[in-house]
Amino acid sequence: MQGVLNRIDRLPFFLQTLFTSRYNFIRRKKSPLGGLYFLKNTFERKLLPRLERVNELCGMNETASIGFLSERDQYARLPDMNDKELRKFAARIASQLWSKYEELSDAWAEAYGGKETLFTDEAQSHLYGQVAGIARAFNITPMFWKKYRKGQMTIRMAFSAISRLIKDEWWVNQLKAQRMRWREALLIAAGEVNKDRSPYASKIAIRDVHARRLANLEYLKSCELENKITGERIDLISKVMGSISNPEIRRMELMNTIAGIERYATSVGDVGMFITLTTPSKYHPTRQVGKGESKTVQLNHGWNETAFTPKDGQRYLCRIWSLMRTAFKDNDLEVYGMRVVEPHHDGTPHWHMMLFCKPGQRKAINEIMRRYALKEDGHEKGAAKQRFESRHLNQGGAAGYIAKYIAKNIDGYALDGQLDNDTGKPLKDTAAAVTAWASTWRIPQFKPIGLPTMGAYRELRKLPRGVSIACEFDDRVEAARAAADEGDFERYIIAQGGANMPRDAQAVRVARKVTDEVNEYEEDIERVVGIYAPHLGTDRVHVTRTAEWRIVPKVLAVEPLTLKSGSAAPRSPVNNCGKLTGGEVTVMAPSPSEHAAAVLDLVDIGAIRLDDPEVVMVLKAALKQDALSPKRLQKSG
């Protein structure tokens, strides 16, 4: 028994706590013999092999490189690292890669006749291959790795990729993402993610995602957007809440899009299908036994060897969908619609797709999809029923059919009283867990299929209401603008040329421009500036984004210090609670990590760009301020 307890002690702290508390509970509430049974049978025989397999797959990739064997034990501690330890580890990796790059550069210059020989595609491709190859030990795919393997590397590509590999902050972001997924993979292996414990995502993941969002919200409240030219300021939080970053607006846009797709399909005589695709059983860490209310969750031993994560399940579904699309193309078949990705109770993803096609093509499309859905392990029990399901959609019923899945995966809107088929729990309560799952594994939940670009639709909606642009372009472009202006997605599809129209043949596309600035990796910055019509030429651009904005801290109105109150005025002007106050409003000073996380959320709405030098300067200033504040507090104390 002591040997098993010692094994528990070697696990990350969050798992130590989990298993130790469970052992003590069983021992206290049942019997010492029950506690011993838990240790020997449940933990050592069933759970420990799963945990060890996850650690083996997530640990250092010695097959890719043995250049970092000295850091193997430290890397194995990643799930248990705090932020301070992680930053030190990231800095050490970046420093070693920089030293390796310098060493290889000197060797190349000496062998081929001086430092000027380094500035060629051949030289930098060689150096990149060595440095990036070593970095792959940490389970990352360096930028442009596929280009390098194909012999298509250029000096500019090499500089961009290497400049990331030798930067501390880049490694901090990579390691934080890995830490989050590694922890969740261990909790899945431990049986903590299922309908009986915590459906869709672990309690730790749900808590962490919720905490990050609260931190982001505090940051957004503490900042404003400032016009670079006029100095005009607007609330950052109001800008975000008026964009698709707001779950309510995102849901409404999706529902409007789906309703428009269905109306378009009806107008052209197409028929609808509701498709469900799932993964083979080996991707599921658990299985359900029994029926109805007596159904229970058991560990799936077929998962133990592969230890697939939800990300692996998503890759599988993307791979078979790619094969299906190729088969459609080879057989002159076309589909269009919307895809929704959601998790099973144990975190394994599955797809729901609302697809439309010509009536005469539906049978062939279903046969192709079924064939590829059952290609891997199609012989296993239940595969024919579970892996692929296709239902005919009644005219006018598609939007209502898929609305539940959209609300469940965003904000739980209008789901009061409805129960989740997977967990038996209220659907309204599952939205937080599902969004935490998507955030943890970075799985996009919604994707249009075969539709005109959504980017152009959103840019057209930025134009002044009711103002024609026909004189600037032509009637095709004006028809697209008018449709977007009214939120009529059916007319927008028609104006763009219909479903499955190649982008270059669409009436309107997003216009981008390379600015005079470069980012921190010395790369050109490309910004969305407006729209253009491919059939009229790329030089005719209508600008939709006339102003440039930057994030700035709010100006806080600080009340003058008086000595009229009964309490003594503080000796130090520093608020030792770490808060800034303005009148009766208290604003939390955001931490550097909060700044960085919120900036990532703002990239999607087009208000700022992460690679904007102004943004980088703001974040660096915040980092510096946070680093200095403890020292100031100590002095003032």
Predicted regions and their residues:
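Right-hand nucleic-acid polymerase module
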Residues: 1-347, 359-637
